[in-house]
Amino acid sequence: MDDDDDSCLLDLIGDPQALNYFLHGPSSKSGSDDVTNAGYSAANSNSIFANSTNADPKSALKGVSDQLGEGPSDGLPLASSLQFLEDELESSPLPDLSEDQPFDILQKSLQEANITEQTLAEEAYLDASIGSSQQFAQAQLHPSSSASFTQASNVSNYSGQTLQPIGVTHVPVGASFASNTVGVQHGFMQHVGISVPSQHLPNSSQISGSGQIQLIGSFGNQPSMMTINNLDGSQIILKGSGQQAPSNVSGGLLVHRQTPNGNSLFGNSTSSPVAQPVTVPFNSTNFQASLPVHNIIIQRGLAPNSNKVPINIQPKPVQMGQQSAYNVNNLGIQQHHAQQGISFAPTSSPQGSVVGPHMSVNIVNQQNTRKPVTSQAVSGTGGSIVIHSPMGQPHTPQSQFLIPTSLSVSSNSVHHVQAINGQLLQTQPSQLISGQVASEHVMLNRNSSNMLRTNQPYSGQMLNNQNTAVQLVSGQTFATSGSPVIVNHASPQIVGGQMPLQQASPTVLHLSPGQSSVSQGRPGFATMPAVSGMAGPARFPAVSSASTAHPTLGPTVQSGAPGSNFTGDQLTQANRTPAPVSVSHRLPVSASKSPSTLSNTPGTQQQFFCQAQKKCLNQTSPIPTSKTTDGLRPSQIPGLLSTALPGQDSGSKIMPATLGATQAQPESSVGSSPSQTAVQVDSHPGQKRPAAKQLTKGAFILQQLQRDQAHAVTPDKSQFRSLNDTVQRLLSYHVCQGSMPTEEDLRQVDNEFEEVATQLLKRTQAMLNKYRFLLLEDAMRINPSAEMVMIDRMFNQEERASLSRDKRLALVDPEGFQADFCCSFKLDEAVPETPLDRSDQHRSKTSSLHQVPRAQSRDRAKPGMAEATNHDQFHLVPNHIVVSAEGNISKKSEGHSRTLKFDRGVLGQYRGPPEDKGGRRDPAKVSRCSPGPEGHRKSLPRPDHGSESKLPGVLASSHMEMPCLDSFQDKALRNSPKNEVLHTDIMKGSGEPQPDLQLTKSLEKTFKNILELKNSGRPPSDPTASGAADLDFPSFSPMASQENCLEKFIPDHSEGVVETDSILEAAVNSILEC
């Protein structure tokens, strides 16, 4: 798109119709709605990139610019025009938008409104700083094409592509990225290929949004920058040469990296015109959260045609706490391993691009604590990179630098390696010096098995430790002259979990070339936290040779034996300059006990790894570094390098023997105690390296805490190998703070427990009491509760069905029915069930008469419970009613006595109710007991007060012990033929409408009978003659249960099944009696 188009676009933005027509053309296909698609294409898409099918670097740029508020401006010539976007989008409309979807002018206008003067000015600046679009043809990124990312500023989905938050969409970005050397590793943008140090990032103030990716490309000394705001996911796709990566690649960053030498980043020795896509899968374990990318600055590599120049990070003057500095958020790294405020300055190689020493790159982990750390200029370093670790840990001594991933780097002699997302950004010296080891060669990764293994198929590839291990990207040579190459190990848990947690890569050993002036500074820094944290096996001595390093050693380094633990790139030399390591340099083996010597056998290493580690942990006092120096002789170095370049101790002292040449004295390799993990190699064979910086007591404590934390976070789940191992691994979980509890404390705890237990018991008892009270209330109810009514209805229904069956059976086979009925009645009596009797009032009468005597006999046995005269027995009724023999019957009126009886029936369950109750009860009882007989009388005139079948069940208890009872029953029977009905009604709730009247009549008759008995001079113990009868029916009077039964029965009367209550009662009584 030319400037005219840009101005045209600006004109159109104000006119919705014109814009719509311009964007969609007469076809008005909403699918071609590039702005809408770019900004709002898929509200549900997490991808930052436009759909690969229609995502062109140009369109992507436009979407990004629109979203970023850096929309195309007059000043920014865009390589692609809206017309191109329209064609592209029409040809492949974004999936989320259907053609029939109405075009939302408001959204488009709002989106276009994001283009502000500030963004226009910024674009103009970029345009001015970037070469004309003609460079685009040269595969140099066009400024406009520099934005290969399409991103909606706040829209979760872009280009209708739905991406898992962590997953990276491999969207091929337009061919415009042809030879761009931008590399993305492990969710981080790596600064590569910036040949123009003069490039400065725009002020952080210009950058809006917490997460930004800035692409800084310098082509022909015209760096371009693109800022992407709010990169929600780690989906960053960098496209190398013109080939587009398959859009459907899932689960990884698609990185096309083509360097002049080929994909050196990925270790491709051949420089292919087409960048090779590399997919770096994201491991969910690498991300503690979705990958918020904060201000990632990507520096574009040189054009393939340009000479390969040292790639240096172009640091912007350090702006403390500002994101304008290179801010890289450790997406993949678990920050707990990183230390806060670790600063390390990269030394640019002497030939390195001009970087003002004042310019430092801040890699700020924008997580909880962003402490501005003053970048420390390393001696002669062009700039320093300051990493603020989320740990918030105090800064380590300046001489010592911890990469958040626990690499310890000395600011002075070492190019600072940044662990970002577990990958180290490394500055590359402009040229590899013989003394320098190409980072590719040197990159070593500690395998979880404690073996160095080449985790990545390509040497250039960064080794990503899923844990917090820091990895050097071998693709770039990061060692500057005199700067040691640092090898990073996998996370401490890989080390066997014994390594201190903090140092995922504490295993890194640094060689400080004594020859380089820097080396002295380096000796000063110790890998201390890292090494100390790491078990020996975890440490890899980083081998770096000073620029003066002997070339002969370089081959040895490169020749690192495959057996060597560096599985990592064993110093693979693809595109590597032999990195001669001067023999004079000694590998600093900060490996724990094991000497720096690496056993060729990974297994051995693994075996001893834990032991060495333990030893390291156990060691608190630094081992004389001189040992290391002694142990590692120049002569030995070649062997170490050849066998195990890292000079990594196998992790156990035993390993040295297996190592052979690498068997440099284990002691020496352990040279430093974990606390003094940094072991420095003498610059010269005869020289003794400078003493490692002594750690303070606070540092020791901090290290121990970090190790304990690391063990806790990544515990070693292997079996305990020895008592010491057990103690070492478990002790950190049993560190107690404070004093032992005193007796007072124990008493206090006991008291608290007692209080709680007492309260619990009280609550339990209260609940129990409440339950019992409810039961009592239910028993005292005159009218049955709803539950009982339902139960009675069900029983009544069953009884009716049973009665109908019995009637049919009686008609069909009377004799057989009688025989069965008698047997069943006996069974019912024995068993708490008299349903048939109840069902059949008539039949039940007979049987109930028999039952009643039995029940009465039982009652008589039980009468002792009741008053002697009353022989009151208590029978439990399902309603929790206790049926007792009739108590004293008072002469009070039937209705009054009934009321009292019901009222007091519950109250005086175990005592003969007062005469009122008794009197009332007697009628009831009589109706139940004597009337029961009467009721039964229907079938048998006055048999023993064969209480209704119900009664037998409920009252079955009451038996007339005395002849009076019989006479009373007879009288009752005679007097109240309806008593049966009454009983039936009362007891069973016959459901007849008459029950009340019948009950009243029955009660009257019962009273009369009782009075007659009294008058007859029957001397019942009870005050009333009826009392005798009552005594015979002892269960009646005292039994509130009877009253309850009566209550129940009364409702039952209305219900109309007399037998139901009696069945329940009889069953319960039978059980109780049994």
UniProtKB/Swiss-Prot annotation:
Composition bias, Basic and acidic residues: 889-904, 913-925, 934-948
Composition-biased stretches (Polar residues): 544-576, 591-603, 620-629, 660-680
Source organism superkingdom: Eukaryota
Spell out the subunit comment: Component of the multiprotein chromatin-remodeling complexes SWI/SNF: SWI/SNF-A (BAF), SWI/SNF-B (PBAF) and related complexes. The canonical complex contains a catalytic subunit (either SMARCA4/BRG1/BAF190A or SMARCA2/BRM/BAF190B) and at least SMARCE1, ACTL6A/BAF53, SMARCC1/BAF155, SMARCC2/BAF170, and SMARCB1/SNF5/BAF47. Other subunits specific to each of the complexes may also be present permitting several possible combinations developmentally and tissue specific.
What are the coiled-coil residue ranges? none
Q: Where is this region: Disordered?
A: 542-603, 620-689, 834-874, 887-952
Task: Tell me what gene encodes this.
Answer: Bicral
Q: Output the GO biological process annotations, alphabetical, semicolon-separated.
A: chromatin remodeling; negative regulation of cell differentiation; positive regulation of cell population proliferation; positive regulation of stem cell population maintenance; regulation of transcription by RNA polymerase II
Q: Which Pfam families match?
A: GLTSCR1
- From the Swiss-Prot or TrEMBL record, give the protein name: BRD4-interacting chromatin-remodeling complex-associated protein-like
Per UniProt, the keywords (alphabetical) are:
Phosphoprotein
Q: What does this protein do?
A: Component of SWI/SNF chromatin remodeling subcomplex GBAF that carries out key enzymatic activities, changing chromatin structure by altering DNA-histone contacts within a nucleosome in an ATP-dependent manner.
Question: What GO cellular component is one of the record's annotations?
Answer: GBAF complex
Entry keyword annotation includes Phosphoprotein: yes
Q: Does the keyword Transmembrane apply?
A: no
Q: Which residues does the record list as Phosphoserine (modified residue)?
A: 621, 976
